[in-house]
Amino acid sequence: VADLFDNIVAWLLDRALSDESIESTVSELCSRLVEGGVPLARVSVGRTVLHPVIGLMDMAWDRETGKVETNALTRDIVRGMTEFNAPFGTMSRGETDRIFADLTDPADVARYPLFAELAEQGITAYFAAGRTYGHRQELFDTYGKSFRGGSVSFATKRFSGFSKTDLEGLERLIPPFCVCLRIADDRFVATGLMG
C-alpha cells in the first residue's frame, strides 16, 4: 500500500515532465504534505543556475501565507559571498549532504545565524538535504565553489518537532524534488537564452 510519501514521489516525477512552474510545484508539494499531516511551517529551496547573469535562485514557502516567494542572486553577488554561514552553504561546499537541527536546543540554535532567527519565529525543528547535478563543477570562486545542484529545507513549529516518519519521508522526497529543480533550471536557462 502506497503511503503519503510514495504518492508524492510519484507525483513529483510526473510533475517534473509537465510544463508547470517550479513555484506551483513547491506550493502544491507543501499543500500535499500539510494535508497529509506533516507539520510544515516553512520550506526553503536554493539552487545554482548555469546562467550568464543569475547564479543562484531561491524560493521560500510559508504556511501562514501559503505563498511562494522567489529571488534570484546574480553571479557577482554570489562571488562576494565568501563566508556564507548557513545550512545551504555548508551543503554546497560538500561538508555534509543533510542537516538536522532541534531548534529547542541552544547548542543547535548556535550553529547558524539562520537557526537563531527561526527559533525566534517559533520553529522547533529543521531538516535540509540536497543533491548535486552530475559531477561537481567549478562555478564560483567562493560560495559552493564546485556545487551545481539544489537544496531544500523543511521547518516545523510543532512542539515535538518532526517525527521519525516525517523525517524519513521528507528525505525520500529529495531526489525526485531535485529532478524537478534541475528541469526547471534547464527550462529557465533555455527560455532566457533562446526566448
Cite the ranges covered by each PLM segment.
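Short amphipathic alpha-helical segments
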Residues: 6-14, 19-34, 111-116, 167
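Allosteric cytosolic regulatory segments
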Residues: 151, 171-182
